[in-house]
Protein backbone atom coordinates (compact mmCIF):
# COMPACT_ATOMS: atom_id res chain seq x y z
CA UNK A 1 0.00 0.00 0.00
CA UNK A 2 1.22 3.51 -0.78
CA UNK A 3 2.31 5.87 1.98
CA UNK A 4 -0.19 8.26 3.56
CA UNK A 5 1.28 11.27 1.83
CA UNK A 6 1.27 9.56 -1.57
CA UNK A 7 -2.41 8.66 -1.18
CA UNK A 8 -3.22 12.21 -0.05
CA UNK A 9 -1.30 13.82 -2.93
CA UNK A 10 -3.06 11.63 -5.51
CA UNK A 11 -6.53 12.63 -4.30
CA UNK A 12 -8.38 15.25 -6.30
CA UNK A 13 -9.61 17.82 -3.81
CA UNK A 14 -12.91 19.57 -4.29
CA UNK A 15 -12.92 23.38 -4.07
CA UNK A 16 -13.55 24.37 -0.46
CA UNK A 17 -16.76 26.18 -1.51
CA UNK A 18 -18.24 22.82 -2.62
CA UNK A 19 -17.33 21.23 0.72
CA UNK A 20 -18.92 24.16 2.55
CA UNK A 21 -22.13 23.81 0.54
CA UNK A 22 -22.61 20.28 1.95
CA UNK A 23 -23.35 21.84 5.35
CA UNK A 24 -25.22 24.87 3.96
CA UNK A 25 -22.32 27.29 4.17
CA UNK A 26 -22.14 29.88 1.41
CA UNK A 27 -19.10 31.31 -0.36
CA UNK A 28 -19.50 34.60 1.52
CA UNK A 29 -19.29 32.69 4.84
CA UNK A 30 -15.70 31.71 4.11
CA UNK A 31 -12.26 33.28 4.26
CA UNK A 32 -10.35 31.02 1.84
CA UNK A 33 -6.72 30.03 2.29
CA UNK A 34 -6.05 28.86 -1.25
CA UNK A 35 -8.50 26.45 -2.91
CA UNK A 36 -8.65 23.72 -0.27
CA UNK A 37 -9.06 25.31 3.16
CA UNK A 38 -10.89 28.24 4.69
CA UNK A 39 -11.81 29.90 7.93
CA UNK A 40 -15.46 30.55 8.75
CA UNK A 41 -15.98 34.29 9.22
CA UNK A 42 -17.53 35.98 12.24
CA UNK A 43 -20.71 37.00 10.45
CA UNK A 44 -21.40 33.36 9.58
CA UNK A 45 -20.39 32.12 13.04
CA UNK A 46 -22.81 34.49 14.76
CA UNK A 47 -25.63 33.55 12.37
CA UNK A 48 -25.09 29.78 12.70
CA UNK A 49 -25.05 29.88 16.50
CA UNK A 50 -28.55 31.38 16.55
CA UNK A 51 -30.21 28.44 14.80
CA UNK A 52 -31.97 25.79 16.88
CA UNK A 53 -30.56 22.78 15.05
CA UNK A 54 -28.39 20.47 17.17
CA UNK A 55 -26.93 17.33 15.64
CA UNK A 56 -25.91 14.16 17.44
CA UNK A 57 -22.48 14.24 19.08
CA UNK A 58 -20.30 11.11 18.82
CA UNK A 59 -17.10 10.99 20.88
CA UNK A 60 -14.24 8.74 19.74
CA UNK A 61 -11.72 7.62 22.35
CA UNK A 62 -9.44 4.59 22.66
CA UNK A 63 -7.52 2.10 24.74
CA UNK A 64 -4.18 3.14 26.25
CA UNK A 65 -1.75 4.21 23.49
CA UNK A 66 1.07 1.83 22.56
CA UNK A 67 3.93 1.76 20.04
CA UNK A 68 1.78 -0.75 18.11
CA UNK A 69 -0.64 2.05 17.18
CA UNK A 70 -4.40 2.32 17.60
CA UNK A 71 -5.41 4.55 14.68
CA UNK A 72 -7.98 6.64 16.55
CA UNK A 73 -7.87 9.57 14.11
CA UNK A 74 -8.06 7.13 11.19
CA UNK A 75 -11.18 5.54 12.70
CA UNK A 76 -12.77 8.92 13.44
CA UNK A 77 -12.24 10.06 9.85
CA UNK A 78 -13.21 6.70 8.31
CA UNK A 79 -16.34 6.53 10.44
CA UNK A 80 -17.27 10.06 9.42
CA UNK A 81 -16.78 9.14 5.77
CA UNK A 82 -18.91 6.01 6.19
CA UNK A 83 -21.77 7.93 7.82
CA UNK A 84 -21.53 10.62 5.13
CA UNK A 85 -20.91 8.58 1.99
CA UNK A 86 -22.33 5.13 2.75
CA UNK A 87 -25.30 6.07 4.92
CA UNK A 88 -25.78 9.46 3.19
CA UNK A 89 -26.17 11.42 6.41
CA UNK A 90 -25.28 15.07 6.87
CA UNK A 91 -21.97 14.73 8.74
CA UNK A 92 -19.17 16.92 10.07
CA UNK A 93 -15.90 15.79 11.63
CA UNK A 94 -14.30 18.03 14.29
CA UNK A 95 -10.62 17.35 15.00
CA UNK A 96 -7.62 18.96 16.65
CA UNK A 97 -4.87 20.66 14.66
CA UNK A 98 -1.60 18.74 14.89
CA UNK A 99 1.32 20.34 16.69
CA UNK A 100 4.21 20.79 14.27
CA UNK A 101 6.89 19.78 16.77
CA UNK A 102 5.95 16.09 17.07
CA UNK A 103 5.60 15.85 13.26
CA UNK A 104 9.39 16.18 13.09
CA UNK A 105 9.88 14.03 16.18
CA UNK A 106 8.20 10.75 16.96
CA UNK A 107 4.40 10.88 17.13
CA UNK A 108 3.59 11.68 13.53
CA UNK A 109 0.67 13.73 12.31
CA UNK A 110 -2.96 13.77 13.34
CA UNK A 111 -4.59 13.67 9.93
CA UNK A 112 -5.47 9.96 9.87
CA UNK A 113 -3.91 7.34 7.64
CA UNK A 114 -4.33 5.24 4.52
CA UNK A 115 -7.71 5.81 2.85
CA UNK A 116 -9.06 7.70 5.86
CA UNK A 117 -7.34 11.09 6.00
CA UNK A 118 -8.11 14.77 6.13
CA UNK A 119 -6.46 16.91 3.47
CA UNK A 120 -4.38 18.89 2.55
CA UNK A 121 -2.34 16.75 4.97
CA UNK A 122 1.01 18.52 4.39
CA UNK A 123 -0.52 21.92 5.16
CA UNK A 124 -2.47 20.67 8.17
CA UNK A 125 0.62 19.02 9.66
CA UNK A 126 2.91 22.00 8.99
CA UNK A 127 1.75 25.64 8.79
CA UNK A 128 -1.97 25.22 7.96
CA UNK A 129 -3.76 28.59 8.38
CA UNK A 130 -1.17 29.97 10.78
CA UNK A 131 -3.08 29.35 14.02
CA UNK A 132 -0.09 27.78 15.79
CA UNK A 133 2.18 30.62 14.72
CA UNK A 134 -0.35 33.17 15.98
CA UNK A 135 -0.48 31.35 19.31
CA UNK A 136 3.30 31.23 19.56
CA UNK A 137 3.48 34.96 18.83
CA UNK A 138 0.81 35.68 21.46
CA UNK A 139 2.52 33.52 24.09
CA UNK A 140 5.90 35.15 23.59
CA UNK A 141 4.53 38.68 23.26
CA UNK A 142 2.83 38.26 26.63
CA UNK A 143 6.07 36.99 28.18
CA UNK A 144 7.99 39.93 26.69
CA UNK A 145 5.40 42.44 27.93
CA UNK A 146 5.59 41.04 31.46
CA UNK A 147 9.39 41.16 31.48
CA UNK A 148 9.28 44.71 30.12
CA UNK A 149 6.82 45.74 32.84
CA UNK A 150 9.21 44.48 35.50
CA UNK A 151 12.18 46.19 33.79
CA UNK A 152 10.49 49.56 33.24
CA UNK A 153 8.35 50.06 36.30
CA UNK A 154 7.17 47.09 38.34
CA UNK A 155 4.91 49.22 40.51
CA UNK A 156 3.09 46.04 41.58
CA UNK A 157 6.41 44.63 42.81
CA UNK A 158 6.15 41.35 40.84
CA UNK A 159 8.78 38.83 41.93
CA UNK A 160 10.73 37.88 38.75
CA UNK A 161 11.43 34.43 40.22
CA UNK A 162 7.71 33.76 40.71
CA UNK A 163 6.52 34.44 37.16
CA UNK A 164 4.33 31.49 36.17
CA UNK A 165 3.92 32.25 32.47
CA UNK A 166 6.06 30.18 30.13
CA UNK A 167 7.40 31.12 26.73
CA UNK A 168 6.31 28.98 23.78
CA UNK A 169 7.59 27.37 20.61
CA UNK A 170 5.91 24.79 18.35
CA UNK A 171 9.11 22.76 18.22
CA UNK A 172 10.36 19.80 20.26
CA UNK A 173 13.42 21.29 21.99
CA UNK A 174 14.49 19.87 25.35
CA UNK A 175 17.25 22.49 25.69
CA UNK A 176 14.59 25.15 26.35
CA UNK A 177 12.93 23.45 29.32
CA UNK A 178 14.94 25.51 31.80
CA UNK A 179 16.65 28.75 30.81
CA UNK A 180 17.82 32.05 32.29
CA UNK A 181 16.80 35.31 30.61
CA UNK A 182 18.21 38.80 31.00
CA UNK A 183 21.80 37.64 31.47
CA UNK A 184 24.60 40.18 31.40
CA UNK A 185 24.05 43.83 32.21
CA UNK A 186 20.74 45.38 33.28
CA UNK A 187 20.53 46.68 29.70
CA UNK A 188 19.37 43.13 28.77
CA UNK A 189 16.52 43.08 31.29
CA UNK A 190 16.07 41.64 34.76
CA UNK A 191 17.83 38.30 35.06
CA UNK A 192 15.56 35.46 36.16
CA UNK A 193 14.85 31.80 35.51
CA UNK A 194 12.33 30.96 32.79
CA UNK A 195 11.21 28.07 30.63
CA UNK A 196 9.56 27.17 27.34
CA UNK A 197 6.59 24.86 26.82
CA UNK A 198 5.57 23.59 23.41
CA UNK A 199 2.88 25.93 22.05
CA UNK A 200 0.02 23.44 22.42
CA UNK A 201 0.83 22.94 26.12
CA UNK A 202 0.48 26.63 26.92
CA UNK A 203 -2.54 28.01 28.75
CA UNK A 204 -3.30 30.28 25.80
CA UNK A 205 -3.97 27.21 23.65
CA UNK A 206 -6.48 25.95 26.21
CA UNK A 207 -8.08 29.41 26.34
CA UNK A 208 -8.35 29.58 22.54
CA UNK A 209 -10.11 26.20 22.55
CA UNK A 210 -12.55 27.13 25.32
CA UNK A 211 -13.47 30.71 24.35
CA UNK A 212 -16.92 31.33 22.83
CA UNK A 213 -16.11 34.63 21.14
CA UNK A 214 -13.58 37.47 21.17
CA UNK A 215 -15.01 39.06 24.33
CA UNK A 216 -14.76 35.72 26.15
CA UNK A 217 -11.24 35.26 24.78
CA UNK A 218 -10.23 38.70 26.05
CA UNK A 219 -11.76 38.10 29.48
CA UNK A 220 -10.00 34.75 29.84
CA UNK A 221 -6.64 36.23 28.82
CA UNK A 222 -7.17 38.99 31.38
CA UNK A 223 -7.79 36.36 34.06
CA UNK A 224 -4.51 34.53 33.42
CA UNK A 225 -2.30 34.35 36.51
CA UNK A 226 1.03 36.03 35.73
CA UNK A 227 2.72 35.25 39.03
CA UNK A 228 3.06 36.62 42.55
CA UNK A 229 4.38 39.80 44.12
CA UNK A 230 7.18 39.96 46.68
CA UNK A 231 4.51 39.91 49.40
CA UNK A 232 2.66 36.84 47.99
CA UNK A 233 -0.20 38.60 46.19
CA UNK A 234 -1.42 37.10 42.87
CA UNK A 235 -1.05 39.24 39.74
CA UNK A 236 -3.34 38.77 36.74
CA UNK A 237 -2.88 39.90 33.13
CA UNK A 238 -5.79 42.36 33.39
CA UNK A 239 -3.93 44.25 36.13
CA UNK A 240 -1.18 44.92 33.59
CA UNK A 241 -3.58 45.76 30.74
CA UNK A 242 -2.20 43.37 28.13
CA UNK A 243 -5.35 41.36 27.37
CA UNK A 244 -6.48 43.49 24.42
CA UNK A 245 -3.21 43.20 22.54
CA UNK A 246 -2.96 39.44 23.06
CA UNK A 247 -6.59 38.94 22.01
CA UNK A 248 -5.88 40.98 18.87
CA UNK A 249 -3.07 38.57 17.99
CA UNK A 250 -5.47 35.62 18.39
CA UNK A 251 -8.69 37.03 16.91
CA UNK A 252 -8.15 35.37 13.52
CA UNK A 253 -6.92 32.11 15.05
CA UNK A 254 -10.18 31.87 17.02
CA UNK A 255 -12.15 31.23 13.80
CA UNK A 256 -12.48 27.49 12.96
CA UNK A 257 -10.83 26.01 9.86
CA UNK A 258 -12.80 24.06 7.24
CA UNK A 259 -11.14 21.28 5.21
CA UNK A 260 -12.19 17.91 3.74
CA UNK A 261 -11.44 14.21 3.93
CA UNK A 262 -10.13 12.11 1.04
CA UNK A 263 -13.80 11.28 0.36
CA UNK A 264 -14.87 14.93 0.61
CA UNK A 265 -16.61 14.81 3.97
CA UNK A 266 -16.47 18.28 5.59
CA UNK A 267 -14.14 18.60 8.58
CA UNK A 268 -13.48 21.41 11.05
CA UNK A 269 -9.88 21.25 12.26
CA UNK A 270 -9.20 23.75 15.01
CA UNK A 271 -7.09 23.96 18.15
CA UNK A 272 -4.92 21.25 19.60
CA UNK A 273 -4.20 21.04 23.34
CA UNK A 274 -2.43 17.85 24.44
CA UNK A 275 -4.55 15.39 26.44
CA UNK A 276 -1.84 14.31 28.87
CA UNK A 277 -1.12 17.86 30.08
CA UNK A 278 -4.27 19.77 29.05
CA UNK A 279 -7.86 18.91 28.11
CA UNK A 280 -7.09 17.26 24.76
CA UNK A 281 -10.01 18.31 22.55
CA UNK A 282 -10.49 20.58 19.55
CA UNK A 283 -12.07 23.99 20.10
CA UNK A 284 -15.57 24.31 21.53
CA UNK A 285 -16.19 26.91 18.80
CA UNK A 286 -15.64 24.25 16.12
CA UNK A 287 -17.66 21.52 17.84
CA UNK A 288 -20.57 23.82 18.60
CA UNK A 289 -20.62 25.13 15.02
CA UNK A 290 -20.56 21.55 13.74
CA UNK A 291 -23.53 20.67 15.96
CA UNK A 292 -25.53 23.57 14.49
CA UNK A 293 -24.53 22.72 10.90
CA UNK A 294 -24.92 18.94 10.64
CA UNK A 295 -26.95 15.95 11.82
CA UNK A 296 -23.96 13.93 13.09
CA UNK A 297 -20.73 15.29 14.54
CA UNK A 298 -17.70 13.10 15.18
CA UNK A 299 -14.99 14.36 17.47
CA UNK A 300 -12.12 12.67 19.26
CA UNK A 301 -10.46 13.02 22.63
CA UNK A 302 -6.70 12.67 22.90
CA UNK A 303 -5.05 9.43 24.06
CA UNK A 304 -7.18 6.91 26.03
CA UNK A 305 -10.47 7.18 27.90
CA UNK A 306 -8.58 7.85 31.14
CA UNK A 307 -7.09 11.07 29.74
CA UNK A 308 -8.89 12.76 26.85
CA UNK A 309 -12.06 10.75 27.37
CA UNK A 310 -12.38 11.65 31.04
CA UNK A 311 -11.56 15.30 30.40
CA UNK A 312 -14.06 15.52 27.56
CA UNK A 313 -16.88 14.05 29.64
CA UNK A 314 -16.15 15.87 32.90
CA UNK A 315 -14.88 19.19 31.56
CA UNK A 316 -15.15 19.89 27.82
CA UNK A 317 -18.78 18.78 27.48
CA UNK A 318 -19.80 21.45 30.04
CA UNK A 319 -18.70 24.05 27.46
CA UNK A 320 -20.65 22.52 24.56
CA UNK A 321 -24.22 23.08 23.45
CA UNK A 322 -24.87 19.39 24.18
CA UNK A 323 -23.14 16.39 25.74
CA UNK A 324 -22.16 13.23 23.78
CA UNK A 325 -24.94 10.98 22.47
CA UNK A 326 -22.61 8.00 22.00
CA UNK A 327 -19.00 7.00 22.65
CA UNK A 328 -16.74 4.89 20.44
CA UNK A 329 -13.75 3.09 21.96
CA UNK A 330 -11.08 2.20 19.39
CA UNK A 331 -9.02 -0.94 19.95
CA UNK A 332 -6.60 -3.12 18.00
CA UNK A 333 -5.54 -6.73 18.42
CA UNK A 334 -1.88 -5.68 18.23
CA UNK A 335 -2.15 -3.02 20.92
CA UNK A 336 -3.94 -5.36 23.32
CA UNK A 337 -1.30 -8.05 22.82
CA UNK A 338 1.29 -5.37 23.60
CA UNK A 339 -0.53 -4.63 26.87
CA UNK A 340 0.13 -8.25 27.86
CA UNK A 341 3.62 -8.74 26.39
CA UNK A 342 5.17 -5.29 26.90
CA UNK A 343 7.11 -5.68 23.64
CA UNK A 344 6.50 -5.14 19.92
CA UNK A 345 8.70 -8.11 18.92
CA UNK A 346 6.01 -10.77 18.39
CA UNK A 347 2.85 -8.80 17.73
CA UNK A 348 2.54 -10.20 14.20
CA UNK A 349 2.18 -13.74 15.58
CA UNK A 350 -1.19 -15.14 16.59
CA UNK A 351 -1.40 -15.16 20.39
CA UNK A 352 -4.85 -15.70 21.85
CA UNK A 353 -3.60 -15.91 25.44
CA UNK A 354 -1.87 -12.53 25.18
CA UNK A 355 -5.01 -11.06 23.65
CA UNK A 356 -7.14 -12.37 26.53
CA UNK A 357 -4.74 -10.88 29.07
CA UNK A 358 -4.46 -7.55 27.24
CA UNK A 359 -8.24 -7.33 26.92
CA UNK A 360 -8.36 -6.18 30.54
CA UNK A 361 -7.08 -2.80 29.33
CA UNK A 362 -9.94 -2.45 26.84
CA UNK A 363 -12.45 -3.70 29.40
CA UNK A 364 -11.48 -0.92 31.79
CA UNK A 365 -11.71 1.73 29.07
CA UNK A 366 -15.14 0.42 28.05
CA UNK A 367 -16.34 0.54 31.64
CA UNK A 368 -14.91 4.04 32.08
CA UNK A 369 -17.00 5.31 29.19
CA UNK A 370 -20.04 3.35 30.34
CA UNK A 371 -19.77 4.97 33.79
CA UNK A 372 -20.75 8.30 32.20
CA UNK A 373 -24.14 6.82 31.25
CA UNK A 374 -23.48 7.20 27.52
CA UNK A 375 -24.04 4.32 25.04
CA UNK A 376 -20.72 2.70 24.06
CA UNK A 377 -19.52 0.69 21.06
CA UNK A 378 -16.07 -0.77 20.36
CA UNK A 379 -14.57 -0.47 16.88
CA UNK A 380 -11.72 -2.88 16.22
CA UNK A 381 -9.23 -1.35 13.80
CA UNK A 382 -8.09 -4.35 11.75
CA UNK A 383 -4.43 -4.73 10.80
CA UNK A 384 -3.26 -7.05 8.00
CA UNK A 385 -1.48 -9.29 10.52
CA UNK A 386 -4.61 -9.91 12.63
CA UNK A 387 -5.95 -13.45 12.32
CA UNK A 388 -9.63 -14.35 12.07
CA UNK A 389 -9.38 -16.24 15.36
CA UNK A 390 -7.97 -13.18 17.13
CA UNK A 391 -10.67 -10.89 15.75
CA UNK A 392 -13.43 -13.35 16.63
CA UNK A 393 -12.07 -13.75 20.16
CA UNK A 394 -11.82 -9.99 20.73
CA UNK A 395 -15.34 -9.41 19.43
CA UNK A 396 -16.61 -12.18 21.70
CA UNK A 397 -14.80 -10.78 24.76
CA UNK A 398 -16.30 -7.33 24.18
CA UNK A 399 -19.83 -8.56 23.57
CA UNK A 400 -19.76 -10.68 26.73
CA UNK A 401 -19.63 -7.34 28.55
CA UNK A 402 -22.88 -6.26 26.92
CA UNK A 403 -21.26 -3.89 24.43
CA UNK A 404 -21.35 -4.28 20.64
CA UNK A 405 -18.10 -4.59 18.69
CA UNK A 406 -17.45 -4.19 14.97
CA UNK A 407 -14.29 -4.85 12.96
CA UNK A 408 -13.46 -2.00 10.55
CA UNK A 409 -10.94 -1.56 7.74
CA UNK A 410 -11.20 2.16 7.05
CA UNK A 411 -7.42 2.45 6.65
CA UNK A 412 -7.32 0.10 3.66
CA UNK A 413 -10.80 0.57 2.19
CA UNK A 414 -11.97 4.03 3.21
CA UNK A 415 -15.68 4.41 3.98
CA UNK A 416 -16.46 0.99 2.49
CA UNK A 417 -14.47 -0.60 5.31
CA UNK A 418 -17.23 -0.30 7.90
CA UNK A 419 -20.77 0.57 6.77
CA UNK A 420 -22.35 -1.74 9.33
CA UNK A 421 -20.23 -0.22 12.09
CA UNK A 422 -21.35 3.24 11.00
CA UNK A 423 -25.00 2.17 11.20
CA UNK A 424 -24.48 0.73 14.69
CA UNK A 425 -22.91 4.01 15.82
CA UNK A 426 -25.82 5.98 14.36
CA UNK A 427 -28.29 3.67 16.10
CA UNK A 428 -26.59 4.34 19.44
CA UNK A 429 -26.48 8.10 18.87
CA UNK A 430 -30.16 8.10 17.93
CA UNK A 431 -31.20 5.91 20.86
CA UNK A 432 -31.72 8.82 23.25
CA UNK A 433 -30.16 6.82 26.07
CA UNK A 434 -27.33 9.22 26.86
CA UNK A 435 -27.70 11.19 30.08
CA UNK A 436 -24.26 12.26 31.22
CA UNK A 437 -23.20 11.48 34.79
CA UNK A 438 -19.98 13.25 35.84
CA UNK A 439 -17.18 11.67 37.83
CA UNK A 440 -17.25 14.46 40.42
CA UNK A 441 -19.49 17.27 41.61
CA UNK A 442 -18.68 20.82 40.55
CA UNK A 443 -18.55 22.04 44.16
CA UNK A 444 -16.12 19.31 45.30
CA UNK A 445 -12.77 20.67 46.50
CA UNK A 446 -9.50 19.90 44.70
CA UNK A 447 -8.63 16.80 46.68
CA UNK A 448 -12.11 15.32 46.36
CA UNK A 449 -12.08 15.79 42.59
CA UNK A 450 -8.63 14.23 42.28
CA UNK A 451 -9.59 11.27 44.46
CA UNK A 452 -12.77 10.56 42.50
CA UNK A 453 -10.93 10.58 39.16
CA UNK A 454 -8.07 8.50 40.58
CA UNK A 455 -10.30 5.84 42.12
CA UNK A 456 -13.18 5.72 39.61
CA UNK A 457 -11.28 6.17 36.32
CA UNK A 458 -7.68 5.12 37.02
CA UNK A 459 -8.75 2.52 39.64
CA UNK A 460 -6.07 3.69 42.08
CA UNK A 461 -6.31 2.76 45.75
CA UNK A 462 -5.76 6.35 46.83
CA UNK A 463 -3.79 9.56 46.31
CA UNK A 464 -0.49 10.70 47.82
CA UNK A 465 0.65 14.34 47.83
CA UNK A 466 4.11 15.86 48.07
CA UNK A 467 4.64 18.66 50.59
CA UNK A 468 4.93 21.05 47.65
CA UNK A 469 1.52 19.96 46.31
CA UNK A 470 -0.06 20.36 49.75
CA UNK A 471 1.27 23.93 50.00
CA UNK A 472 0.05 24.79 46.50
CA UNK A 473 -3.43 23.48 47.30
CA UNK A 474 -3.52 25.70 50.42
CA UNK A 475 -2.43 28.70 48.30
CA UNK A 476 -5.30 28.10 45.86
CA UNK A 477 -7.79 27.82 48.72
CA UNK A 478 -6.46 31.10 50.12
CA UNK A 479 -7.26 32.95 46.88
CA UNK A 480 -10.63 31.18 46.45
CA UNK A 481 -9.68 29.02 43.48
CA UNK A 482 -9.98 25.56 45.02
CA UNK A 483 -13.35 24.63 43.46
CA UNK A 484 -12.31 24.79 39.80
CA UNK A 485 -12.33 21.65 37.59
CA UNK A 486 -9.12 19.62 37.68
CA UNK A 487 -7.10 18.51 34.67
CA UNK A 488 -4.75 15.71 35.66
CA UNK A 489 -1.41 15.64 33.84
CA UNK A 490 -0.47 11.98 33.67
CA UNK A 491 1.36 9.53 31.43
CA UNK A 492 -0.84 8.32 28.60
CA UNK A 493 0.66 4.82 28.61
CA UNK A 494 -0.84 3.55 31.86
CA UNK A 495 -3.86 4.01 34.09
CA UNK A 496 -1.31 4.72 36.83
CA UNK A 497 1.34 7.46 36.86
CA UNK A 498 4.01 4.83 36.03
CA UNK A 499 4.16 4.25 32.27
CA UNK A 500 5.57 0.75 32.80
CA UNK A 501 2.40 -0.52 34.49
CA UNK A 502 0.53 -1.81 31.46
CA UNK A 503 -2.84 -3.52 31.16
CA UNK A 504 -5.30 -2.73 33.94
CA UNK A 505 -3.08 -2.29 37.00
CA UNK A 506 -4.36 -2.26 40.58
CA UNK A 507 -2.80 -1.83 44.00
CA UNK A 508 -1.28 1.58 43.32
CA UNK A 509 -1.63 5.14 44.55
CA UNK A 510 -1.66 8.23 42.36
CA UNK A 511 1.29 10.49 43.24
CA UNK A 512 0.53 14.20 42.98
CA UNK A 513 3.69 16.30 42.64
CA UNK A 514 2.11 19.70 42.24
CA UNK A 515 -0.92 21.75 41.22
CA UNK A 516 -1.03 24.93 39.16
CA UNK A 517 -3.82 27.38 38.48
CA UNK A 518 -4.78 28.05 34.86
CA UNK A 519 -7.17 30.82 35.76
CA UNK A 520 -7.91 31.96 32.22
CA UNK A 521 -8.75 28.41 31.17
CA UNK A 522 -10.75 28.05 34.42
CA UNK A 523 -9.08 24.83 35.54
CA UNK A 524 -6.34 23.50 37.80
CA UNK A 525 -3.59 21.31 36.37
CA UNK A 526 -2.61 18.46 38.69
CA UNK A 527 0.87 17.11 37.91
CA UNK A 528 1.67 13.44 38.47
CA UNK A 529 4.63 11.28 37.51
CA UNK A 530 7.06 12.64 34.93
CA UNK A 531 5.05 14.56 32.35
CA UNK A 532 6.89 17.08 30.17
CA UNK A 533 5.33 20.16 28.59
CA UNK A 534 8.31 20.55 26.23
CA UNK A 535 9.06 17.28 24.39
CA UNK A 536 12.48 16.35 23.09
CA UNK A 537 13.46 14.73 19.80
CA UNK A 538 14.30 10.99 19.51
CA UNK A 539 17.61 9.58 18.32
CA UNK A 540 16.18 9.19 14.81
CA UNK A 541 13.73 12.10 14.44
CA UNK A 542 11.09 11.88 11.73
CA UNK A 543 12.72 15.00 10.27
CA UNK A 544 15.45 12.78 8.80
CA UNK A 545 12.88 11.18 6.49
CA UNK A 546 11.20 14.39 5.31
CA UNK A 547 12.23 16.16 2.10
CA UNK A 548 10.90 18.46 -0.61
CA UNK A 549 11.70 18.48 -4.35
CA UNK A 550 12.27 21.43 -6.64
CA UNK A 551 8.56 21.56 -7.50
CA UNK A 552 7.69 21.98 -3.83
CA UNK A 553 6.34 18.42 -3.45
CA UNK A 554 6.93 17.18 0.10
CA UNK A 555 7.83 13.56 0.82
CA UNK A 556 8.38 11.52 3.98
CA UNK A 557 5.43 12.90 5.96
CA UNK A 558 4.15 9.46 7.08
From Swiss-Prot:
It is an enzyme of class 6 (ligase). The keyword Repeat does not apply. One of its GO terms (molecular function) is formate-tetrahydrofolate ligase activity. This is Formate--tetrahydrofolate ligase 1. Pathway: One-carbon metabolism; tetrahydrofolate interconversion. It comes from the Bacteria. ATP binds at residues 66-73. It catalyses: (6S)-5,6,7,8-tetrahydrofolate + formate + ATP = (6R)-10-formyltetrahydrofolate + ADP + phosphate. PROSITE patterns: FTHFS_1. Belongs to the formate--tetrahydrofolate ligase family. GO terms for biological process: tetrahydrofolate interconversion. HAMAP family: FTHFS. Keywords: ATP-binding, Ligase, Nucleotide-binding, One-carbon metabolism. The gene is fhs1. Pfam families: FTHFS. Its EC number is 6.3.4.3. The keyword ATP-binding applies.
